[in-house]
């Protein structure tokens, strides 16, 4: 289906636009559809994005942007002052604050921009000139919510797909890796992201090991385990506990990871950045949900599904869970339940429909 901007003529003229989003890699990746909508509505404008060092990697080589401005995560007063001077020199006419936290609100207010747009959160609402209700009558996908922020500009966008491009060189790197491990295009290739730094989003490692074996033994799948900075030892332990010898990917950057996921048939994982990268590459996904709300983090299309224990306390949106529950939402979610959810995704995985299990 072709997606279009419903209102191509923006209500506000702006030749210089700044978008602000801090925090995690996934937060910035899920903001890229906003850039697509802005570039469609403002094809000749100068568009910049203000973020932090780690998530800023998502925006490398993004063709929709003219500039990526990096704010150090723990900026000193001098660095804050230098950043503000740089922003004011750019003479932005429109600032869109997607995160709306105290730091971004102050920067937006002091940017010198005439038009300052954000979600309404009192008292920070006082720093902006245009506000959109923060709460929606029904739960909504995070990307849809951020696109809703553009409606005061007369922009109504419907394309929810995140953007993470990769080069031919990165594609060649992935192809060489797959050849080295004798993974052929005919095989069912499943990428699993088995880690999360927040305990209430982390399915037990032993469960992942058992799932890897089940995928190999019952479906004949080739399984690759994904990992990021500080996660290698944890993922190595998961691989060592599996009988089927899953392969760990190398220490790749985000764009090479995107090139890999573009070649995969299916993604399984926790609610973290690799999920959103998989979505950006158009492959079906299954997300193991603990404390978070699946509606907020999954696209509405049926090929992106969640599996959860469905306890009364879900979703609690908490980062920790002590007695008496002790993260029961993840502990009690069985490997068989998750495998059944994988099988339910067969309508969107062509190879899963025709491959016979191999033991």
Predicted regions and their residues:
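Catalytic machinery of carbohydrate-active enzymes
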Residues: 1-359
């Amino acid at each position: 289906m072709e997606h279009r901007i419903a209102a191509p003529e923006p209500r506000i003229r702006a030749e210089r636009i700044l978008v602000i989003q801090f925090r995690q890699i996934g937060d910035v990746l899920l903001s890229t559809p906003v850039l697509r909508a802005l570039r469609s509505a403002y094809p000749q404008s100068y568009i910049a994005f203000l973020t932090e060092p780690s998530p800023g990697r998502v925006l490398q080589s993004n063709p929709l942007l003219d500039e990526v401005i990096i704010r150090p995560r723990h900026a000193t007063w001098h660095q804050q002052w230098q950043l503000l001077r740089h922003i004011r020199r750019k003479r932005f006419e429109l600032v869109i604050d997607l995160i709306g936290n105290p730091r971004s609100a102050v920067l937006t207010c002091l940017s010198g921009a005439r038009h300052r747009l954000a979600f309404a959160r009192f008292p920070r609402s006082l720093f902006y000139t245009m506000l959109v209700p923060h709460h929606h009558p029904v739960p909504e996908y995070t990307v849809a919510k951020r696109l809703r922020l553009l409606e005061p500009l007369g922009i109504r966008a419907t394309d929810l797909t995140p953007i993470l491009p990769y080069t031919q060189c990165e594609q060649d790197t992935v192809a060489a890796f797959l050849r080295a491990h004798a993974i052929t295009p005919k095989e069912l290739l499943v990428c699993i992201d088995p880690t999360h730094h927040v305990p209430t989003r982390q399915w037990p490692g032993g469960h992942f090991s058992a799932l890897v074996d089940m995928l190999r033994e019952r479906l004949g799948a080739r399984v690759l385990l994904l990992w990021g900075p500080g996660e290698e030892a944890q993922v190595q332990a998961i691989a060592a506990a599996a009988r089927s010898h899953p392969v760990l990917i190398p220490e790749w950057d985000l764009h090479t990871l995107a090139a890999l996921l573009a070649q995969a048939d299916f993604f399984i994982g926790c609610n973290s950045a690799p999920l959103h990268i998989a979505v950006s590459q158009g492959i079906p996904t299954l997300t193991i949900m603990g404390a978070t709300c699946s509606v907020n983090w999954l696209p509405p299309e049926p090929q992106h599904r969640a599996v959860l224990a469905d306890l009364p306390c879900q979703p609690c949106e908490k980062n920790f869970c002590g007695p008496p529950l002790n993260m029961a939402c993840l502990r009690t979610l069985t490997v068989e339940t998750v495998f059944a959810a994988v099988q339910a995704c067969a309508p969107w995985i062509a190879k899963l429909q025709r491959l016979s299990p191999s033991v």
